[in-house]
Amino acid sequence: MPAPCCSSYRKGFTVPISPSIFKAYDIRGIVPSTLNESVALKLGRAFGQQALAAGEMVVAVGRDGRLSGDELSRALIQGLVDAGIEVIDIGRVTTPMLYFAANTLCHSGIQITGSHNPKDYNGFKMVLAGRAIYGDEIQKLRQIMEKEAWRMQGGGKVRQADVTQAYVERIVGDVKLARPMKIVVDSGNGIAGATAPGIFRALGCEVTELFSEVDGNFPNHHPDPSKPENLKDLIEALQSGDAELGLAFDGDGDRLGIVTKDGQNIFPDRQMMLFAQDVLSRVPGGEIVYDVKCSQRLAPAIEAAGGKPVMFKTGHSLIKARMRETNAPLGGEMSGHIFFKERWFGFDDGTYAGCRLLEILSRAQNPSAVLNALPTSYSTPELNVACEEGEPHKLTAELQAMAPSVFSEPAQINTIDGLRVDWPDGFGLIRASNTTPVLVLRFEGHTQAALHRIQNEMKALLLKVKPDAVVGSAAH
């Protein structure tokens, strides 16, 4: 079918594009001030040109449940068609379902999503020729968009496709539960609510649903399970009913939160211990990739299960790229992105990770006891230090240069992503965020005293390079 007429979008070409929307792993901004139909149209044309240059003729387009998704989708699709692309419009889906389409229907795709950002945000996550694009590739798109350096071509067209049935069948055909489980699922009014509860029921679970209605106003709580305040309703439902476990999803369904019957939040680095043990039972010696924010307890757990632990840079695109290089069967980030290559496609998917978790825990009579028994330490939540634009990377370079003269044995210095210093009883991390102008701090100690000592040592170093540093809780 032909694309809808978009003459109104063409009039927007005089509007300058805000450089702030081009992030390390995606394009993201506030609607309509920095992200609007004009930007979406230009992105469609620029991405379409890059796709054709890579030999990609077909691009899937999906969108989450945000209020601005429909208008941005229309403009993006028009831009892709202008570039000569065949667009497969898969409608309102989770980000992992867009990735699924880009693995099964074609090799490239764009998801319109604001992820876990406030409701007036939206953005674009992109896959080109089977790879999540990031960094320089996003900057190349920016250059094409700013210069309007595209060629309009004929031959573009749009068709609709529904991937839901194929996606559900693929998961239900892969995951088998040893027994039915009773769970509570909190989708936070994000797009996962449209599919995740039904998938869990298809696996044999008894599901109590919280906030499954897709509503871009997010009227109940923000869809970000990495923040404890967003898990209160889930914990209350668990403790007032007879469910065994609670699962929570972020706004676009690519991250998973887990809560035990007694209200304990099982953070992603501890989830990875369980997933690694399971995956390595079938892929002995496999490389398990995780980011620098993860617990010091994770590497020994991977080694004990017969795997090779590999610490890498934070960023879902970076973790996926590293996994592809080494054929790693599993990867994970402290932010909640879990990447299964074993039995799956290697992309981050909160629903699929939840299903794999249930498969493991269905073998136990007391799932909460299994989760609570995973090794843990005393740790801080993610902390932020606000900086000027461009300052965080400069500061981390200074910290990396100073560290060898400040920290001595038995401290081990790691500079793969900022500065991480490991002691026998804990670690400290200071790194530059790739998405906002802040330093990201995280500390862990085997005891409260160790945590306190490590925090003080790392903060003392930070104050040498940024005397006005104010450490606060992370905000998204």
Regions of interest found by a model, annotated:
Residues V283-R442, T447-H476:
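Phosphate-binding and adjacent anionic-ligand microenvironments
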Residues H107-K119, L238-T260, N265, P309-M311, ...:
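Glycine-rich phosphate-binding loop
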Residues Y9-L76, D82-A83, K157-K182:
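An N-terminal, well-structured beta->alpha segment
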Residues I90, K140-E169, G173, K261-M334, ...:
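Proline/glycine-rich low-complexity loops and linkers
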Residues D120-G241:
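Gly/Ser/Thr-enriched, mixed-charge loops and adjacent short helices
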Residues C5-C6:
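Cysteine-centered motifs
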